[in-house]
Amino acid sequence: MIKTLSKAQKMEREKFRIPRSVQDAIPIRRIFADGIFQVGNQYSKTWSFTDINYAIASKEDKTSMFLDYSELLNALDSGASAKITIYNRRINKAEFERSVLLPDKADGLDEYRHEFNKMLTAQVTGTSNSIVRERYLTVSVVKRNADEARSYFARVGTDLVTHLAQLSSVAQELTLTERLHIFRDFFKAGEQAAAEFNIHEHAKRGQHFKDWFCPDSMEFAADHFKVDARYGRVLYLQDYASYIKDSFVSELCDLDRDLMLSIDILPVPTDEAARQLQSTLLGVETNVANWQRRQNANNNFTATIPYDMELQRKETKEMLDDLTTRDQRMMFGLVTLVHLADSKEQLDSDTETLYSTARKHLCQLSTLRWQQKDGLDTVLPYGLRKIQALRTLTTESTAVLIPFRAQEIMQPNGLYYGQNVVSKNMIVADRRLLLNGNSFRLGVSGSGKSMSAKEEIVQIALSTEDDILILDPESEFGYLTEALGGEVIRISATSDTHINALDMDRAYGDERNPIVSKSEFVLSLFEQLIGDGMVTAKEKSILGRCTEQVYLPYIRNGYKGTPPTLQDFYRLLQMQPEPEAQGLALSSELFITGTLNTFARHTNVDTQARIIAYDIRELGEQLMPLGMLVTLDAIYNRVIRNWKIGKRTWIFMDEIYLLFRYEYSANFLYKLWKRIRKYNGLVTGLTQNVDELLRSDTARLMLANSEFLVMLNQSATDRVELAKLLNISDNQLGYVTNVPAGCGLIRCAGNIVPFTNSFPRNTKLYKLMSTNPSEKKE
């Protein structure tokens, strides 16, 4: 026997004690405040790690991930054993309601909250999408005391986190409470704890730490066990196929039940493994020589070596080559699995399903007869291995049992964005937590952009007190805005709605003197009227002087009363002695006293509403540049005002490509994208003209720097451009190629996840959000 294995078995050997209570059946001897357990003669520590997009990666990316995972396995210390655990647990109902569902507010909008909650609840009442899949890595080592173990885990933990980071998986050391939660969720599924575990409080009260998570009863039979009212069974992988697909573990874990699968790994030092293989090879060669000698003695000089001997020789040589020339390591592996059900019949049915899945991969799962207790202690992430059905593997053959499948986006207190196509789990993201929460929604006409944005607006309006500002060039958001109690400001040359371009309060501008900020705005306004670069230095001086003079009475009155208008500014210009002032007045006459004077009068709409949609569809070509300037100025200063009182602002800009046609609005957007996070705001841009958007270098930069992107069905040319810009693989592009409305890819903080999102049609919210012309007629 290999020295490493015999030493490990000797260290792990314990005296058998008949458990007198449920607590005695839990094999943890001691716990420490930093999450270390003493189990048997060993100390163990657990890390959680996130999933990566392995299933939808391209062949090249899969190979790269496989090699990186192999490096992680090679980095495991041969003085310790490792356990990789995949835990499927059912979503906790109370936790789901607290973090995802919208609470009632008695503000007249609860009807919409109930509709939205009904849709969210329907997403998790099925089977597959009510399961959360978690991943853990537990390292166990024999040390003389906890301090030695602590030093060891500190060193090993750094290596593990680094290697998992190369795979784009985020590893995190589990605290004591987080680690105990794994066992509580397993033994007491769905039962809410009266209080979180606190080691000091438990010690003060004289309670045993096991009381917090152990079940009320545990019964072990020949081929199953019972935990309280639930049934469970531990299986192990008895026979391995010659070639196992990398999807094997993932398919085993697709069972829609509470399930835990563990892969125990005991690495062997390469020199020791090589010596063992050389000894084995020598034995094989000796057997071959003896067989050949016997054949020669019988005058059988043409006999070929028996197949089993030849195969043994070939496999031993190949494994020796793997170790000496291909940087492989020898490892002992063990795969165990426990699944739970509400009845014995369901348990037997699930076991047969798992057997069938294994047979499909030419492997054999078997039930641990009369070893259910030892099996349970092995599969749970205590850090123990009590089942000795070890299989000799290399790094590659261990790496095939890869625990990765599909990335999940499930952030607490986030907004719902659809369902993960691969895992069927909900996608819940919190843009507020991202380094840059700005977002684009890209897709051809009819792909579901507006619907997706409206669904996000509904959630923000119903679940927060944040302000929502919408720039609406296509008149698509009016009905929804009014239904949510907001204000629609329809701006055109012929409408009775007016917005005063010179509106200003004490909070105007960022952190500077409001009059300085307003002077810059007035200068930009006249550059739009006269032409960019056409305003001379003399004219700039006149404009600055007039801005100060026109606001003087208003400022002296403490920013109270009625602010001046462009008509007041026009009269002041006419009173200036310089001929340039008369030229400025004449150039601006059409937009101040003429027919296009929409922005030259006092504001006559509610610009303080919590939700505002600026409908600029009817502005026309002549008034559009000025309209954009005034509207964007109003939006920006609302953001600043909210920031000063500690309020968040969400901005939605439909057909954002239109803003890049005008230099001022393009520059404004770029500055807004860079600075809005500082002012507690988030911007979302929607467009179907991705090609036109990408012609702007500014837009490309904004797109690349946005941490949250929703990509729906794309045209062929747009797909190619986006793939280059955002590094999207061909496999992933398939999710934005000829797909139904509401389907596509979400990129959140660099993670790309395929999603689908359909809202129930028989709801009031759907009718408010739908932009389908045929549905609007209905």
Please describe what each predicted stretch is.
Residues 459-469:
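Post-Walker A helix-loop "phosphate-sensing" segment adjacent to the P-loop in P-loop NTPases
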Residues 485-489, 698-711:
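A short helix-turn-beta junction within AAA+ P-loop NTPase domains corresponding to the substrate/partner-engaging
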Residues 52, 59-78, 89, 253, ...:
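P-loop NTPase motor domains
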Residues 726-778:
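Conserved P-loop NTPase
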Residues 441:
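Hydrophobic anchor at the beta1->P-loop junction of P-loop NTPases
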Residues 452:
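Hydrophobic positions on the alpha1 helix immediately C-terminal to the Walker A/P-loop
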Residues 449:
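Conserved lysine of the Walker
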